Amino acid sequence: MSFHVSAQSVRAVAGGLVAAATLLSGLALAPTAMAADSATADNAPSVAGHAYNELPYNNPDVTVTQIDNSALPSYMRNPIGQNEGIDTPNDLSQNYYSADASALSYDGKLFVFTGHDEASPDYGSFNMKDWGVYVTDEDGLNQGKWTHYKTIAKADLFSWATGDGAYAGQVVADDNGTPSDTSDDWFYYYVPVKDKASEAAGQDPFAIGVAKSKSPLGPWKDAIGKPLLTTSQTQIETIDPAFFVDEDGTGYLHFGTFGTQLAIKMKKDATTGRTSYTETETKTDGTTPNLHTMKDADNNANGPKGFFEAAWVFRKGDTYYNVYDGGKPGSGTATCVESNYQACIQYSTSDSPLGPWKYQGVIVPSGSATTMHPSVLQFGDKWYVTYHTGDKEGGTDFRRAVCIDEVDWTADGQMTSTAHPTKAEKTQPSTNVASYAKVSATFTETPAYKGSVNDGRVLQTIVVPPNHWTNYRSIPQPQSGDSLVYQWDGTVRANSSKVWFDVDSNALRAPASWKIQYLDADGTWKDVTSPSGYTTTTGKANPNTVTFDAVTTTALKLDMTG
């Protein structure tokens, strides 16, 4: 159990299973009575693809890597980017982190477009300047083979953009009204980037740009020479564009974040009636974007219930589906996470692409990153959901990897998925079974997450709240008697614990004292005997390790005072 502690309160950082070459913090437990592996070939999802490397392209920035996960167990093949580098020694491949996946099915190929996380392990923000794409086809879905085209486009392709903030985008194909003839097709890439003029004016710089290409691999060029939409026009941070063309030919662009989802129709050609991919509908003045605010069917909020960001809208039959990052605490029945710095994938439905939206439920539970950013599409005769996690080796909330899993449908049109974004189990045995325990705490600050103490990650720098547990309160400190408990379904035999404490410049500090207790067979908590000592050293380089007489128990408690 690793703790990140602070002035007048205690916070704990990621902990868990020690295995392979990665040190994952947690309660150090004796090797007896280990919990069974939770991921097996029978209960874990299996999705992958066959390498496709035949598209014509002429893009000098592109680097191509072949990914072959076919030798891995089936349940480890679906994290496309998470396992990249396992079978390919290329350093660029091993160190490549991808996020914000959006999928496109075109000409028998599956394209998963992503952003590129370049943040260092201790950097507490996004560093994103370009986009890439994973490509496969239907023939080898279970082989785990992909072709990764890196840097198919850069944010600085827009002369009006700063070259930074290459966040989540989407590529759509325009068949120019001739679906049987692909020779005249164009591709449009809707991406959020930072606008130079807005930034110079001290405004939120994010804007949506649209690029154009004859190939989904590029090269891409600015389609209109200016932002399609800016934050000053929309009055919300203008990110996460999602483009959708309805069966009647009307195009819609959805976007938004921080609980507000907006949409705008695209203009139609007066002669042909075809939707424009580069012009939005305006109000009667001819210049003001005609924005539509998405409403929840129950409470008339500024978005579907639980909505945070990353909308993805599509139609199936007569029903419109709105899939998004959601589940923030405070969103009522849509809450599916413990921390407001986490997300799950939820969805709502409507009989209109502009809502109102009726909440339906969760497709994919919360993962290891602060966002998940879904896309959903049909490829062949199956449906899939893409998303990202922070589970790749060396991953953080700003160094992510994309995944893909199957989506199933009930007879009444409800979406379900077997996806559960967790790390694949390590194959080597371990003396540490912290990750198999259920965690409880006497108090957890809202932005923090008690599950971080045994999620299998130890970060050298704690950059956002989900990476630690804290008992900070806005009342006079110190608090006495706060504790964290590991509870197992069966008995374990424990003889040591390793704890990390940390401080910050505000109100967090190490506890005045702490001790380890175990749950006795009679149901009472008892102190472990012969402890080697309870130090309160702070910092990741100085874990506090205590050994004690071995105990057989179903629960261990870290009890803190002061």
Each PLM stretch: what is its role?
Residues F243, S375-L377:
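Catalytic nucleophile loop of clan PA
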Residues M1-D37:
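Secretory targeting and sorting signals
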Residues Y96-S98, S105, F126, G306, ...:
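Short, surface-exposed loop/turn motifs at beta-strand boundaries within globular domains
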Residues S98-D100, A166-A168, T238-D240, F308-A311, ...:
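Conserved positions at the start
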Residues D412-H468, V503-K515, D559-G562:
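Juxtadomain low-complexity/linker regions and immediately adjacent membrane-anchoring helices
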Residues V464-S530, K540-G562:
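Aromatic, loop-rich ligand-recognition surfaces of beta-strand-rich domains
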